[in-house]
């Protein structure tokens, strides 16, 4: 076992305090299965040493297990992208209402389609040629498949939101309204269901905040109705 400790003073008497330490220990001393454990501890609020990062040799060759944080109320902040190459398990996924800025979002995003000159905050459908085009509910072909909200001018760079909180580029209705693909304006949604013969009635989400900001929960239904 090896320990590196970091001491300083508090602002009281002053008194000496240990503010952090690094502890290296044996995790498994079994011959042929040797593994170690490295623990990073910090003083947490009352001076008590608690684990902040624990790195442990796994139960198989080349496996390393890592535990970050201490109790459930601890916060881990990643300033940038996080890449998970296997499974991700999360007890809760928090969606926050988007801001007043068109294209602000939180949710599931794809980066494909090779489409440029998209309108940020407009609704698009995925075409049979592999590109995106603004929706319109006057025919099934322009709104019956995969739908998404453009998050910028280029689908492969800025992304297209498939589900989540997002700010669209128009005023669709009032708070709590059910929203439908619009038959009158390409790329829009509306709280008024299309009613013309041959029009498609498809729910795409709900208004969740001030209508003039265009904050919606975008979650297109997989079914639709054609007006007779």
Q: What does each model-identified segment do?
A:
Residues 11-18, 29-33, 39, 43, ...:
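Glycine-anchored, exposed beta-strand/edge motif detector
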């Amino acid at each position: 076992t090896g320990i590196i400790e970091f001491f300083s003073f508090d602002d009281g008497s002053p008194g000496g305090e240990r503010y952090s330490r690094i502890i290296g220990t044996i995790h498994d001393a079994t011959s042929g299965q040797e593994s170690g454990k490295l623990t990073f501890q910090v003083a947490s609020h009352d001076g008590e040493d608690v684990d902040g990062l624990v790195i442990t040799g796994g139960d198989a060759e080349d496996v390393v297990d890592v535990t970050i944080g201490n109790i459930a109320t601890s916060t881990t902040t990643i300033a940038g992208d996080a890449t998970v190459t296997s499974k991700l398990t999360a007890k809760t996924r928090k969606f926050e209402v988007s801001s007043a800025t068109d294209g602000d979002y939180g949710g599931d995003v794809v980066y494909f389609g090779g489409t440029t000159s998209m309108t940020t905050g407009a609704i698009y459908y995925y075409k049979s040629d592999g590109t995106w085009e603004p929706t319109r509910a006057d025919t099934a072909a322009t709104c019956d498949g995969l739908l998404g909200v453009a998050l910028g001018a280029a689908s492969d760079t800025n992304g297209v939101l498939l589900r989540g909180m997002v700010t669209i580029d128009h005023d669709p209705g009032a708070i709590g309204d059910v929203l439908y693909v619009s038959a009158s304006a390409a790329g829009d949604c509306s709280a008024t269901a299309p009613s013309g013969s041959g029009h498609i009635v498809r729910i795409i989400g709900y208004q969740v905040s001030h209508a003039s900001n265009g904050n919606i929960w975008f979650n297109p239904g997989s079914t639709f109705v054609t007006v007779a």
